[in-house]
Amino acid sequence: KFAQFQYPFKEVYYLETSPRAHRVILYTKTDRLEFTASLEEVFKQEPRLLQCHRSFLINPSNVVRLDKKEKLLYFPNGGSCLIARYKVREVSEAINNLH
């Protein structure tokens, strides 16, 4: 019933909650994968991810651009994530500490 999959961490861009209940969508360098889980469960398994919004977990090392005014993060695949107002500074610092 349960499938297990692994991706190199550097290929993970971000995860978002799905419109379908109790599901999460994973965006990677090559794939888009939807599976049953919560962001909280994923975060417990992979603490290198950063929660930038209640609906998103990101891999800060793959952020291409941070737009503080619009509160958006952009990724190499053209995807974007929202940043909660109170998380902008934390996300900005995490990205700056990587580069």
Which positions does each model-derived feature cover?
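Conserved binding/recognition cores within well-folded domains
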Residues: 1-80
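Long, non-transmembrane cytosolic or organellar matrix-exposed soluble domains/tails
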Residues: 76-99
